[in-house]
Amino acid sequence: MSKKLWGGRFEKGTDKVVEDFHSSIRFDQRLYKQDIRGSIAHARMLGRQGIIAASEAEQIIEGLEKIMADIEAGRVEFDVAAEDIHMNIEKILTERIGDVGKKLHTGRSRNDQVALDVRLYLRDEITETGRLLRELITVLLERAEEHVDTIMPGYTHLQKAQPITLAHHLLAYVQMFGRDCSRLVDCAKRFNISPLGSGALAGTTFPLDRMAVAQELGFDGITENSLDGVSDRDFAIEFCGAASLIMMHLSRFCEEIILWSSQEFSFIELDDAYSTGSSMMPQKKNPDVAELIRGKTGRVYGDLMALLTVMKSLPLAYNKDMQEDKENLFDAVDTVKGCLAVFTPMIRTMRVRGERMKAGAKGGFTNATDVADYLAKKGVSFREAHEIVGKMVLMCVQKSVALEDLSFEDFRACSEAFEEDVFDAIRVERCVADRKVPGGPAPDAVKAAIQAARERLS
């Protein structure tokens, strides 16, 4: 006779190879807190509804609380033969309190049980991931305040484009990570409904109080269709999508950190604590943390694609394929949290070479647009001004000089609209200061943006 909790229908036990292949306890044991919390709420409801005796419910709850304490103290060894965290806990409970433990699963299936556990787990992890994102945003705002006047080149196509400030650049990432926070909040709102009571797929004949269990566990409501409650993992996929966007933003920032810390740019220097050396070349100081985050981005993309692929062809309701959701979800959670935890202090401690940034902003004709704008303000159409300045840039390239190095006679030869004030108008400091439009790099606009971001964060 099989000793499986589901073994009554079978004449012989599972092959050992199948047992090992089938078991998920190796990775789903991290759900023990959520599983026990859900079971306690379920047992309490069973007792309150008179489905089991109140004394039996209390005995089950007390047993589950002791199991929780023993797991946290490292006194529990899980059994591969019991398959998963749900069956392991029920097996331990029954061994400790006897046949009363067998009543815990009344009106419940592992299908709705695991759907509940994963929701509880993801809700906890979204809270922590959001905290890490807000910590990063706080650091970015602090660094932005330090560098409101630190001029640097802005780029398009990785070619110098227009002068901006480091604060303005950092605030772009504040916006991106702020949207990442919003996505996590939205994701949690959508899945914060309890599937418990959906049973295997068609609910149950027992008079369960689904709403009471949902409220005890902090859910906003219950799933409205038992098939949907157990058969979809769109909430896990949505999280992995949000996680992929977080990683994409981190990866873009890391790419810039890697470039900026190179000798060719030399805009920043990373703290020794967030750099590594070479086993052969003694002079090397490598931005390995940034490179590794950039590399791990593809890993999280892979987690998203794996979940989408698992779910793409599954008929309703539950299928064993869905056991494959957890490792990818857990990996995405761990990777994002790990990257945020190391990225934030790296940004907090990096040293900015402001003079080097400003020198970079003075090269590459970053003030060319301002020359065209100057002409437009003098009454020249912008398209004509664009043509004039393009020819001026070509002349400068041929002479190996900057626009501001041209003589006033050179300017007048290109257009009689130029006056002596052109030299002040095209200084990089003036180019930045004049961009006062909301969202622009002018110091006052940046300070307003920092204040607005702080208010959103509070």
From Swiss-Prot:
A biological process term (GO) from this entry: arginine biosynthetic process via ornithine
Q: Which InterPro entries match?
A: Arg_succ_lyase_C (IPR029419), Argininosuccinate_lyase (IPR009049), Fumarase/histidase_N (IPR024083), Fumarate_lyase_CS (IPR020557), Fumarate_lyase_fam (IPR000362), Fumarate_lyase_N (IPR022761), L-Aspartase-like (IPR008948)
Recite the UniProt keywords alphabetically: Amino-acid biosynthesis, Arginine biosynthesis, Cytoplasm, Lyase
Q: In which pathway does it act?
A: Amino-acid biosynthesis; L-arginine biosynthesis; L-arginine from L-ornithine and carbamoyl phosphate: step 3/3
Q: Which cellular component terms (GO) are annotated to the entry? A: cytosol
Q: Which GO terms describe its molecular function?
A: argininosuccinate lyase activity
Q: What is its EC number?
A: 4.3.2.1
Q: Where in the cell is it found?
A: Cytoplasm
- This protein's major location comes to cytoplasm
Catalyzed chemical reaction(s): 2-(N(omega)-L-arginino)succinate = fumarate + L-arginine
In which domain of life is the source organism classified? Bacteria
Q: Which PROSITE patterns match?
A: FUMARATE_LYASES
Q: Which family does it belong to?
A: Belongs to the lyase 1 family. Argininosuccinate lyase subfamily.
Please identify the protein, giving its name as recorded: Argininosuccinate lyase
Please give the organism: Heliobacterium mobile (Heliobacillus mobilis)
